[in-house]
A protein has these predicted regions:
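ATP-binding N-terminal substructure of ATP-dependent carboxylate-amine bond-forming enzymes
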Residues: 1-143, 171-174, 439-456, 460, ...
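Short, charged, surface-exposed secondary-structure boundary motifs
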Residues: 64-68, 143-151, 198-199, 216, ...
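A conserved helix-loop-beta module that forms one wall/lid of the active-site cleft
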Residues: 132-203, 209
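Glycine-rich phosphate-binding loop of ATP-grasp-fold ATP-dependent ligases
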Residues: 186-215, 236-238, 260-278, 331
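Phosphate-binding site of ATP-dependent enzymes
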Residues: 207-263, 313-319
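A long amphipathic alpha-helix within ATP-dependent nucleotide-binding catalytic cores
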Residues: 222, 267-315, 360-382
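ATP-dependent carboxylate/phosphate-activation module, predominantly the ATP-grasp catalytic core
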Residues: 233, 241-296, 301, 324-347
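Peripheral (often C-terminal) accessory segments that flank ATP-dependent C-N-forming ligase machineries
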Residues: 347-466
Length: 466
C-alpha cells in the first residue's frame, strides 16, 4: 500500500477511548518518565478516564505545565559530563528499576496494598517497578532488536535496498573503514556493550584516516564491535510504523535534525520535524521499505507497537541505517497533530486490551501528518540551564529576536536529565512547507550560543541532493 492507495477509513476513536477508560478506571498507576512536563497530557488523560490515583516518578521538571499529581523527583542525570542522551535515560531507568530505599518507601506509601500498575519509558525493558507490574512492557525478543549490529540482516530479510556495511571488532575497524570509505569517509556505530542506545550518542563520522585515532580510542572504551558503513550524503530522515495484530500501519516520512559539527568530526542529534517532504517516488519507496521491515518484525518475533527506520535520502534514493524498535519522536509528532494517545494505545495493544485496525490507523496518521506539521529542536548539553525563552524569527543572516506577532519559533532552555536542554519550537504555519528546517535549527542554536553563552559547537545542516 503506497501513499496513493491508502484506504481513508476513519479510525474508531470512540472505541479506543472506551477501551482505554476500561484500562484506567478504578486503578492506581505509577508513571515513570524522565521529564515530568512530558507526562502532563498523558496523566490528565488517565485521570479523565477514571484512574483512581496517579503518582509520577521523574528525573526533572522540564518545560511546560507539570502534572497535578504526587511527584517524586530522582534528580538523576548523566554522569559522564558529555551530555549524551543515553546517560540521562539510563540513569533514570536505573533509579526506577533498582529503586533506592527512599523511592521504594515513597511508592509503598502511595500504594500500600501493592495493587498499582506501572508505566515505564520507551527504552526501558523493566517488567516491574518496585514490585508493581509494568503495563505494556517490552518483551525480551523485542528489546534484542535494539542491537545495531543486526540492521543489515533485517534489511536483507525485508528485501529492501541498503548501503553495504560490515560488523567488526574495534581493533579491525580501521581496516574496514579503509575498504568502505567514500570521499566523505565512513560512519561507525557501537554495539550494545553498554546497553541500548539512540539519539546518535554512539555514532561517529570518520571522515579520513586523521579521525581514526580518536574514533578507535572512543569505541575502545565503549564497545567490543562496531558496524562500519560508507558515509551517506543527503537529508537524514526516518519513516515510522506501527504493528498491530492485523497488519502494519506506516506513517509519512519526516526529517531527522542530525546536524554536523564544523570544528571537528561528529554528528549532533537535535530532534525531528515533519515540515520536509521528499519527492513522491521517494516517499512511496520509504513507506514500502518500512512496511516490509514491519512485516519481518511481526513474523519473526510477534512484534507489536511502534518502530522506526532511520536513514538518509541520498542521490540514489532512501538508504536505511538503523532500526528503532519502539515509539520515538516521529510517532509523537504525528500523534500530537492527530490528537490520539498513541503511547497509551501502544501499551494496550501489547497487553491485549486493545485491537487496532492497521489500515485505519495508517489512514488517520498519514492524512493528519500531511495536513498539520510539527516537531522541533531538542539539543542536550551537560551544563544545567535555567528556564528561559524568547521569540525568534529567521533572516538571511540567521535567527533574531522577534515580537510575538512576527515569531517563527520559540527558543528556550531548561534543566534536563542530561544536565540542560535547548528547545526550538517552530510555529508550524510559518515554516516553509516541504523544505528542510535543519538550516533554521542551526540558526536558532547559533543564536542561543551567542545570546546565552551556551557551549554549542559550530554546526551545519546536511544538503538536499535528491
Amino acid at each position: 500500500m503506497d501513499s496513493a492507495t491508502i484506504d481513508r477509513a476513519t479510525i474508531d476513536r470512540a472505541t479506543i477511548d472506551k477501551t482505554l477508560a476500561n484500562v484506567y478506571r478504578g486503578q492506581k498507576w505509577i508513571v515513570a518518565t524522565d521529564v515530568a512536563a512530558g507526562a502532563t497530557s498523558a496523566i490528565r488523560y488517565m485521570i479523565d478516564r477514571g484512574a483512581s490515583e496517579v503518582m509520577l516518578v521523574a528525573a526533572v521538571e522540564g518545560v511546560g505545565e507539570l502534572p497535578d499529581v504526587p511527584t517524586h523527583y530522582t534528580r538523576t542525570q548523566g554522569t559522564t559530563g558529555m551530555a549524551r542522551v543515553m546517560d540521562g535515560v539510563r540513569a533514570f531507568d536505573a533509579a526506577v528499576t533498582r529503586p533506592s530505599r527512599t523511592l521504594r518507601a515513597v511508592i509503598d506509601r502511595f500504594d500500600p496494598e501493592n495493587e498499582a500498575l506501572a508505566i515505564a519509558g520507551p527504552f526501558s525493558v523493566a517488567t516491574e517497578i518496585a514490585g508493581r507490574h509494568v503495563y505494556g512492557a517490552k518483551r525480551p525478543e523485542w528489546a534484542a532488536l535494539e542491537d545495531k549490529m543486526i540492521a543489515e540482516e533485517l534489511w536483507e530479510a525485508a528485501g529492501i535496498n541498503h548501503a553495504p556495511a560490515t560488523v567488526v571488532s574495534v581493533a579491525d575497524a580501521a581496516r574496514a573503514a579503509v575498504e568502505m570509505a567514500t570521499l566523505e569517509g565512513t560512519v561507525w556505530v557501537a554495539d550494545n556493550r553498554e546497553g541500548w542506545h539512540g539519539g546518535g550518542d554512539y555514532v561517529r563520522w570518520v571522515r579520513s584516516v586523521n579521525d581514526m585515532a580518536d574514533a578507535l580510542d572512543w569505541f575502545g572504551v565503549h564497545a567490543d564491535r562496531v558496524r562500519v558503513m560508507p558515509f551517506l550524503e543527503g537529508i537524514p530522515c526516518s519513516i515510522h510504523g506501527f504493528v498491530t495484530r492485523d497488519g502494519v500501519a506506516v506513517l509519512r516520512p519526516l526529517e531527522m535534525l542530525v546536524l554536523r559539527r564544523t570544528d571537528r568530526t561528529g554528528f549532533v542529534y537535535a530532534g525531528a520535524a515533519n515540515h520536509w517532504d521528499p519527492p513522491d517516488l521517494d516517499r512511496d519507496a520509504m513507506r514500502n521499505a518500512a512496511r516490509a521491515v514491519g512485516n519481518v518484525l511481526r513474523d519473526r518475533v510477534g512484534y507489536l507497537g511502534g518502530y522506526g527506520v532511520d536513514g538518509v535520502l541520498t542521490e540514489d534514493g532512501f538508504l536505511p541505517t538503523e532500526l528503532n524498535p519502539r515509539l520515538s519522536t516521529g510517532h509523537g509528532i504525528v500523534a500530537h497533530v492527530a490528537d490520539l494517545p498513541l503511547e497509551a494505545m501502544a501499551r494496550a495493544v501489547v497487553e491485549g486490551s486493545l485491537d487496532l485496525a492497521a489500515a485505519e490507523l495508517e489512514a488517520e496518521f498519514v492524512e493528519r501528518g500531511d495536513a498539520v506539521r510539527g516537531g522541533g529542536v531538542r539539543y542536550s548539553i551537560a551544563k544545567v540551564q535555567p528556564d528561559r525563552s524568547v521569540d525568534i524569527c529567521f533572516e538571511e543572516g540567521g535567527a533574531v529576536v522577534a515580537e510575538e506577532e512576527n515569531r517563527e519559533a520559540v527558543l528556550a532552555t531548561a534543566r534536563s536529565p542530561q544536565g540542560g536542554i535547548v528547545l526550538v519550537n517552530f510555529v508550524a504555519d510559518r515554516m516553509p512547507r516541504g523544505r528542510s528546517v535543519a538550516p533554521l535549527a542551526v540558526a536558532a542554536l547559533s543564536h542561543a550560543r551567542a545570546a546565552w553563552s551556551i557551549p554549542i559547537p559550530p554546526l551545519e545542516a546536511a544538503p538536499e541532493v535528491r
